[in-house]
């Protein structure tokens, strides 16, 4: 049987991992064995955090809406309930934007929610 020499393939694999680890600190960017572990871990964090990002943004939007609603004399849950009863279909992302950048429009939405609750 012919001898299989894998130098080219191994070099390519190592280069690929070291390229992905570029910018990492110390041995994590220079030593293949350490860089491989760092790249695998980074991938796990990236996968997890892509899912967490969605949760964190929703939390941020809710916190902003709650703060703005309370300034207008209504709690978050009652405000959302009022909007649903008034059949206003604006998602939390847009509501948070309105709360931050257009306080007059947000106050009008709060009044609409209050009217629907009464």
Curated annotation (Swiss-Prot):
One GO MF term: structural constituent of ribosome
Phylogenetic placement of the source organism: Bacteria, Pseudomonadati, Pseudomonadota, Gammaproteobacteria, Enterobacterales
Keyword RNA-binding: yes
Keyword Lipid biosynthesis appears in the UniProt entry: no
Its job: Binds directly to 23S ribosomal RNA and is necessary for the in vitro assembly process of the 50S ribosomal subunit. It is not involved in the protein synthesizing functions of that subunit.
One GO CC annotation: ribosome
Protein name: Large ribosomal subunit protein bL20
Keywords annotated in UniProt: Ribonucleoprotein, Ribosomal protein, RNA-binding, rRNA-binding
Similarity section: Belongs to the bacterial ribosomal protein bL20 family.
One protein family per Pfam: Ribosomal_L20
InterPro entries: Ribosomal_bL20, RIBOSOMAL_L20_CS, Ribosomal_protein_bL20_C
UniProt-listed Gene3D superfamilies: 6.10.160.10, Ribosomal protein L20
NCBIfam families per the UniProt record, alphabetical: rplT_bact
Domain of life: Bacteria
GO BP annotations listed: ribosomal large subunit assembly; translation
